[in-house]
Amino acid sequence: RIVFKKKNKTKFKIKTICVGNFYLGGTGKTSLSIKINNILKKKKIKSCFIKKYYKNQTDEQKILQNNGKLFMSYNRIDALKSAEKENYDVAILDDGLQDKTIDYDISFVCFNDINWVGNGMTIPAGPLRENIYNLKNYGHIFINGNLDNINNLKKETLKINSSINIHLGKYKPTNLGEFENNCNYLIFSGIGNHKTFVSMIKKSSLKILKDIEFPDHYNYTKKDIDEILDEANSLNCEIITTEKDFQRIKDFKESKIKVLKAELNIIDEDKLINLII
């Protein structure tokens, strides 16, 4: 049930947590959304995902569906209404920071520490949906990746908004035992943060002979997969990809391609828990 409207924004009875970004793609929105949902489930809070439907984002949609209840619509307000009808307590919106029709209870602006703000310019001159100085309008920023340069990124952030809450996260492989350290690997992905994927594998002591980067949400063809298999065969390599990419290639039923699964570990998770519950 809608409670009220304020300045053309709709406020819902259900608690709304928006996990969005400024940088186009690869900022860990889906990973953070899943992490928040898992935290709420452990606390016995009935939570769900909300996502606006985009035809080219079936990979993210399937991953969210594998991790909880997903309400999806061409309009986020309609999806939120459906969640309220089913008596959910919390709605986690994967993307939607620039949707000014909803009055969110909590908003996170997500960044990847490698991509950061790119050239610092907004679309079409750069990768940003909003000017970086708009951080002054938000209360929470989430930075994820290997965090090697995190002190400088914190300083840049606090110069813009000295009161913003900075949350940090690192990716950790969860199925490393399925991979041999004495093998060589060809890795490929079509995600927004390919460099973070590469960095995580290198830090896991797996040897990469070749990495291939495709565009974000890339729609693989049989020809693409055959070329990857041929390349790996010529290099005498095993093949690794991401969970998101696997959602887009599993119809090819190619058993030689292995998936490296990863989870997001929140640094100071108690701080996040106290915020969202």
Predicted regions and their residues:
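Conserved beta-strand/loop subsegment of P-loop NTPase cores
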Residues: 48-49, 108-111, 135-145, 158-173, ...
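Short, polar loop motifs at secondary-structure junctions
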Residues: 95-98, 146-147, 172-174, 242-248
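A short, acidic, amphipathic alpha-helical segment used as a generic capping/interface helix at domain edges
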Residues: 219-237, 244-246
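Structural motif
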Residues: 16-18, 92, 108-110, 142, ...
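Short, flexible loop segments at boundaries between secondary-structure elements
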Residues: 215-218, 256-277
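Phosphate/Mg2+-binding loops and adjacent switch elements
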Residues: 55-161
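Redox- and metal-dependent alpha/beta enzyme cores, enriched for Fe-S-associated oxidoreductases
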Residues: 178-222
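Walker A (P-loop) phosphate-binding motif
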Residues: 2-56
